[in-house]
């Protein structure tokens, strides 16, 4: 009772500890939950949309790496449904329209770009998403299509695309007739061929077309097309299949990805957008038996590996929507197309489209998803509403400054680089308008100038780097050049950047060389030889793509992807490459030694996605290996304590789920460490001997990057799909790491407290009453934060002892008055 009075008007975190607890049990940390601060204004990649035909206010939206979301208000507000499932990547969502509480979900997006994530199979709910059952296909990785039989809810066809990064038999079309208990493979070509598209005849659920697609991705090359690609037809609900050929009017030779669509009002009309030696749109007027080419303009199918879908107006077989970089529409059966949506205008819609839904009863009502979220029109494209409250931004990197309150910053997939507050003294939460875009393109590292965080550095694809002024908006390009103009610089899609902790004017940047600037990017010098393997077989990005070239620099390889500068001793540099090298310089770049080859147990050519020098020991560093690009999803994190002579593995698949992406060690308590993987956040309080997944308030998320704001002792988390998070005040974890879990056996323990500030929150900027459609990130609670633990057994024993002794002494009356007030009933007697 005394403790309750102590904490009046304070923000209190309570950790209730059973006496027998010896491990870091997440159930005990309910009061320590990270805050999702957003942003949502740029949203993120949406992969699938479906709505209930009889009540289209009920919408399900799948995202590339941000989970599954549901709206029951026509897209005004949204609920995340997959926070606790072991996957966050959604390939397809399909509603059983005869019973909309039944929803099927295929995990793993079907757009195999370089940043594609993956899932773990097939899911189903029978209660509208409250609970989910995993049905199998664990190794399918990417499920792209689901067709439900409208006459039998137990019958479904599952179109598995399969992983881009490897060759497996877990591909093709699967069929179930018992609601998913048994999944039979009914169409299989080879280990490289999966589903590109699959559609059903609206007049005959037994008539199905499946476009099989052979493709393969390597870190340095992508190939679309092969002998396995082709169009297949079934007339018995997918039990048996027949391949259509050039004898039926399809193009000759090697084929790639195809998009398919039936016309609902005229089911004999079918369209196929086909990648071939000459990409073209084909049409059938007899339900798919015979085909003819109707449009082979150069732009009709410009980037099929990333988007190749077509849709037909349900009331007009000649009105076709083609989704690609922009959405285009044809009114003449595909003979000609025009851009349908506004582009880079003030009312523009984000490019790169992947999901499309047209109401079958109202063709004016359309929803589409792209790399920047969801847009909705109710007048067939005359006007659009952008859904600005889906916090599914895909951060590649995260960082913080030291302003007061401090800011969080980072770059995102196809959505630029942004800076926004970690918390603020305003009502209304952290709104999208409080975030400032400081660079466009695909954003990567963002780093504040330690001398003045008004300025900073922002990276984008192709090695682009700029120095920005966030007050004026001015930005200047500072990309380094090689002194020899004949030397071509190879920059990774996500090139390495680092600041020197010993000199605020010195920065480093990685191509195949390490570039150093001592004047904040005004000039550069090369301080290393080529630190990669320089394998010419991995330098074919300019011809990447297969049937359709796609030379965007996304496959740049034999490059530097991580640079770590020791904060302990000046001049110690660690460098990681995308082809497996770890290079060490102990003299500021004068000489280099390759030390990664001494690591045993990790595959050659793995990416060293991060390399973190120890804040305590100059000879120590931690290397985070990411080998998923060789279809290996295990975590690999290695530590050296002797300049790379020997290495020890810090995690394995029994402790940590998913390939590792990020690591950070607390700069004050060496026993406290965090690891981010493709599927979550893990914490260790014993220097990596044991890891615990952080589940309190944190979803399954690709945890790309981690930062610690040292003044306020916050862990800041950048996710690739769920925006940014802040775990406020990790001092309790520091104390547990320093003293062990035995600390929690005390009856009551009060942890070190952060500084509290008395502040009066001012009104939010802009709209005061925001309703539900305007996003608001979680602000830090007001008041003083005190975290304490209670061991119920010890506390009750101490309380009993205290009560037994109360009759043996008097006090000044305050305690007795408190007890009287608490008891209450005695006064009435």
PLM region descriptions:
Residues 786-807:
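Short amphipathic, basic-aromatic surface patches that mediate peripheral association
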Residues 1-7, 653:
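Bacterial N-terminal signal peptides that target proteins for export
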Residues 1, 16, 428-430, 497, ...:
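Generic low-polarity alpha-helical segments
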Residues 551-560, 819-829:
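Intrinsically disordered, low-complexity acidic Ser/Thr-rich regulatory segments
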Residues 22-774, 781-782, 791-793:
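Beta-propeller blade termini and top-face loops
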């Amino acid at each position: 009772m005394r403790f309750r009075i102590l904490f009046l008007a304070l923000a209190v975190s309570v950790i209730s500890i059973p006496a027998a607890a010896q491990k870091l049990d997440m159930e005990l940390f309910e009061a320590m939950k990270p805050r999702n601060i957003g942003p949502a204004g740029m949203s993120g990649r949406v992969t699938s949309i479906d709505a209930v035909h009889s009540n289209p206010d009920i919408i399900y939206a799948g995202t590339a790496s941000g989970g599954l979301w549901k709206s029951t208000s026509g897209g005004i507000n949204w609920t995340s449904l997959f926070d606790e499932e072991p996957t966050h990547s959604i390939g397809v969502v399909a509603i059983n329209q005869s019973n909309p509480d039944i929803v099927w979900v295929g995990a793993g997006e079907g757009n195999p770009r370089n940043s594609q994530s993956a899932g773990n199979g097939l899911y189903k709910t029978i209660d509208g998403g409250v609970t989910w059952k995993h049905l199998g296909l664990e190794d399918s990785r990417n499920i792209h299509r689901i067709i439900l039989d409208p006459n039998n809810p137990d019958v479904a066809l599952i179109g598995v695309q399969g992983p881009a990064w490897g060759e497996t038999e877990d591909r093709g079309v699967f069929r179930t007739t018992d609601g998913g208990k048994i999944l039979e493979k009914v169409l299989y070509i080879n280990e490289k061929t999966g589903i590109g598209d699959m559609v059903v005849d609206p007049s005959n659920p037994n008539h199905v077309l499946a476009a099989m697609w052979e493709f393969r991705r390597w870190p340095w090359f992508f190939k679309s097309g092969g002998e396995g690609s082709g169009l297949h037809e079934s007339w018995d609900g997918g039990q048996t299949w027949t391949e259509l050929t050039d004898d039926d009017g399809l193009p000759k030779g090697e084929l790639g990805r195809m998009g398919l669509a039936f016309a609902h009002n005229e089911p004999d009309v079918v369209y196929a957008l086909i990648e071939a030696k000459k990409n073209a749109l084909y049409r059938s007027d007899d339900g798919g038996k015979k085909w003819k080419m109707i449009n082979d303009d150069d732009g009709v199918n410009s980037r099929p590996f990333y988007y190749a879908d077509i849709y037909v107006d349900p009331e007009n077989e000649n009105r076709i929507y083609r989704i690609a970089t922009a959405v285009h529409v044809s009114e003449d059966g595909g003979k000609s197309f025009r851009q349908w949506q506004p582009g880079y205008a003030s009312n523009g819609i984000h490019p790169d489209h992947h999901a499309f839904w047209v109401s079958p009863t109202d063709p004016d009502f359309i929803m589409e998803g792209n790399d920047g979220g969801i847009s909705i029109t109710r007048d067939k494209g005359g006007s659009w509403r952008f859904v600005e409250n889906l916090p599914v931004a895909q951060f590649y990197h995260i960082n913080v400054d030291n302003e007061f309150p401090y800011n969080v910053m980072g770059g995102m997939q196809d959505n630029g680089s942004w800076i926004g507050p970690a918390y603020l003294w305003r009502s209304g939460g952290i709104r999208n308008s409080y975030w400032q875009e400081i660079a466009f393109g695909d954003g990567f590292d963002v780093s504040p100038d330690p001398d003045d965080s008004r300025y900073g550095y922002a990276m984008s694809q192709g090695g682009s780097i700029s120095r920005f002024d966030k007050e004026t908006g001015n930005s200047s390009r500072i990309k380094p050049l090689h002194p020899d103009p004949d030397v071509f610089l190879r920059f990774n899609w996500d090139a390495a950047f680092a600041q020197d902790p010993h000199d605020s004017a010195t920065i480093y940047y990685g191509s195949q060389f390490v570039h150093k600037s001592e004047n904040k990017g005004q000039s550069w010098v090369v301080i290393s030889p080529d630190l990669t393997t320089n394998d010419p077989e991995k330098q074919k990005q300019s011809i990447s793509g297969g049937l359709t070239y796609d030379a965007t620099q996304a496959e740049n390889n034999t490059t530097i992807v991580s640079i770590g500068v020791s904060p302990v001793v000046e001049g110690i540099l660690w460098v990681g490459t995308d082809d497996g090298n770890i290079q060490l310089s102990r003299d500021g770049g004068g000489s280099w030694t390759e030390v990664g080859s001494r690591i045993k147990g990790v595959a050659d050519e793995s990416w060293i996605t991060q390399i973190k020098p120890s804040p305590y020991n100059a000879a120590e560093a931690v290397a985070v290996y990411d080998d998923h690009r060789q279809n290996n999803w295990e975590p690999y994190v290695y530590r050296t304590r002797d300049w790379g002579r020997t290495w020890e593995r810090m995690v394995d698949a029994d402790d940590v789920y998913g390939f590792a992406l990020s690591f950070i060690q607390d700069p004050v308590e060496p026993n406290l460490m965090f690891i981010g993987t493709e599927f979550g956040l893990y914490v260790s309080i014993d220097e990596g001997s044991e890891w615990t997944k952080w589940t309190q308030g944190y979803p399954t998320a690709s945890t790309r990057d981690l930062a610690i704001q040292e003044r306020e002792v916050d862990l800041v988390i950048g996710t690739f799909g769920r925006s940014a998070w802040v775990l406020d005040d990790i001092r309790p974890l520091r104390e547990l790491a320093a003293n062990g879990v035995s600390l929690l056996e005390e009856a009551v323990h009060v942890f070190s407290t952060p500084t509290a500030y008395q502040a009066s929150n001012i009104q939010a900027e802009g709209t005061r009453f925001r309703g539900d459609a305007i996003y608001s990130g979680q602000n830090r609670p007001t008041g003083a934060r005190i975290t304490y633990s209670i061991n119920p057994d010890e506390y009750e024993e101490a309380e009993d002892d205290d009560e037994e002794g109360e009759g043996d002494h008097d006090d000044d009356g305050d305690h007795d008055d408190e007890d009287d007030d608490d008891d209450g009933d005695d006064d009435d007697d």
